[in-house]
């Protein structure tokens, strides 16, 4: 069932003539985090989902993706240092919808994956706080933790305003094709197609953000781990391929070195050339140092030869970014 989502919302932010589109989108994205915080707080107290609030966020995501896909994806993949699980949920919804657009999902499917990804972690607010940030976690406590996606899924039961697949996305986003996921250990075709895509988005975002028991990881390394996991049968290969189309082999924010000696930071992906993103390159040999935007797809003589470390809060504090990554992390979100 397609829902005619509102064109105006609680998230509208007045824009001055000199404000850039990107700056406005960033402000509206922050507004979406605030609305989602209200949604989660209300769910924690009443165990009911206010879909009016949720649709505001999903509608804004759809508008941002249509308006400027690159900026929208950039907002979706910013490493998360605070406001978990609210901001993670907003980002997961946005990235899942970006992947859905690339995969040519129907309007119903886009709404379902956007809404299901947005609310799936609302149940984390019902999990005892003593269980969060603990690794390893005791088995009896793990049983409580892994039930969190079911809380939102149960709240969606019988809600005619939500597309039918929404509940599947919320309930199954942490399931894995090889049966290693939770809460039910579903395998293969038992996992809804949309949930498979949402799972890849959720996992990628979880990896590039720090968790209480580990630092953040370089986006490129997260992509590598997801590709490896897909090869082992944990993730849907079509969903992983779509992630690559959207964020590239070198995701937004990755530090890279080019074969001409310059270092750079990835700005945007090139859908048809996942190993040749658009980046901002820094020439340290130029006096003063020179910055240049470079589209590797239009510069065949240039290529990435090395990927660097992510300069995040974890690395500043001296933590080792080589901490093992789990693609089935309890705290991925």
Task: Give the location of each predicted region.
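Generic hydrophobic, helix-prone segments enriched in Leu/Val/Ile
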Residues: 1, 22-29, 304-307
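N-terminal accessory interaction module
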Residues: 1-5, 253
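A composition-driven signal for long, intrinsically disordered, charge-rich low-complexity tracts
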Residues: 4-7, 196
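Extended, charge-enriched "interface" segments that sit outside catalytic cores
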Residues: 6-33
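Histidine- and acidic-residue-rich, metal-dependent catalytic cores
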Residues: 30-333
